[in-house]
Regions:
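A short linear-motif detector with a strong N-terminal bias
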Residues: 1, 19-23, 35-37, 44-46, ...
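Rieske [2Fe-2S] iron-sulfur-binding domain
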Residues: 49-118
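Peripheral, non-cofactor segments flanking catalytic/redox cores
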Residues: 1-7, 29
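Non-catalytic accessory segments flanking enzyme active sites
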Residues: 17-61, 65
């Protein structure tokens, strides 16, 4: 597989990218760091979580995310994994939960991400 520099050396301004740009893992790793981890990403619409406890799940570059509506209408986004053992907390695409509960050891997190019970 060609390196990023080899592909870039042949790239002509104003022309579309060669197939290698879309398949090269080195380029994807670079884009993850330079673009995806440093930019705002669309995750959903606020109307998808209208009520306190409503949540949607989302994945960004293999990182599971949960977005949940707080009791006062605020919106929180967290890694959808327990900080204890890394278990996925919300396994459904969407739903409503009064708290975020890890299925592994039942650690309980508030909607704002604070640990309530361990």
């Amino acid at each position: 597989m060609e390196t990023r520099n080899q592909l870039l050396s042949r790239q002509r301004e104003g022309w579309s990218l060669e197939q290698g740009f879309y398949l090269n893992p080195e380029i994807f790793d670079f884009e993850k760091e330079a673009i995806w981890k440093n930019s705002w990403l669309f995750a959903g619409f606020t109307c998808e979580i209208p009520n306190p406890g409503d949540y949607i799940t989302y994945s960004v570059i293999d990182q599971p995310i949960v977005i949940i509506r707080g009791d006062e209408g605020e919106i929180y986004a967290h890694h959808n994994t327990c900080r204890h053992r890394g278990s996925v907390i919300c396994t459904e695409e969407s739903g409503n939960e009064p708290n975020l509960v890890c299925p592994y050891h039942n650690w309980v997190f508030a909607k704002n991400g604070a640990l309530k019970n361990a």
